[in-house]
Amino acid sequence: MSVSFGTSGLRGPAIDFTGSTSAAYVRAFLDVICSGVPSRTVYLGADLRASSPEIAGFAAAAISAAGWTPVYAGNVPTPALAAYALARQAPAVMVTGSHIPEDYNGIKFYRPDGEFLKEDEAPVRNRA
């Protein structure tokens, strides 16, 4: 896997987010960071990059396979998804490349209590 955590979220070539890579990181996030969350709903969004719908599909499948309910918000701004999930004390997964080149993409994770922290990265990476 050639994806890695950067300044804000998981980043890498879009092709490297297809299939098992997206699923492994989403599952690790839920298992490690969200294990004690009573709500079993995860809010999921995507940006307008060509690769984002496919990556979001892999993320949704991983969320379901982990026993959670994905709620797909569609193409929404990252802060809107984060605020919506935070107001409901639920985790969120946003597929977005933000400012990086079009052939790259990324996944941002949001904890039920807010921002995914730098210290959250290693446990998720190690589990993935």
Question: How should these model regions be labeled?
Answer:
Residues 2-128:
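Gly/Ser-rich phosphate-binding catalytic loop and adjacent alpha/beta segment
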